[in-house]
Amino acid sequence: MSIAITRTDDLLTVTLEGELNILSAPELERALADELETVDSVVFDLTEVSYITSAGLRVLLATQQAVQERGSVIVRGACDEILEIFEMTGFDTILVIE
């Protein structure tokens, strides 16, 4: 998995490429750890993500919980398969899906 993080003021943009699974989720957690306390919202660009497992969903949920008092988590560019997973798990009601 490739992870690119950019910050603009209080907005963190996380661009991912590959599969967000049990192997890559801890790497993403480590990459986000220092940033989440100082941003209001996080945008996940999933345009190049081909698959997400429960471990990946857990990272998205933990991110939402970390910023919910100040802002939100926005997901952009998710493919139909990932959108279906969000709908089946109720994540489409927790996250902002664009």
What are these regions (language model features)?
Residues 2-29, 47-48:
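STAS-typified acidic loop motif
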Residues 96-98:
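Short acidic-hydrophobic, aromatic-tinged amphipathic segments that line or gate anion-handling sites
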Residues 22-94:
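Amphipathic alpha-helical interaction surfaces in cytosolic regulatory modules
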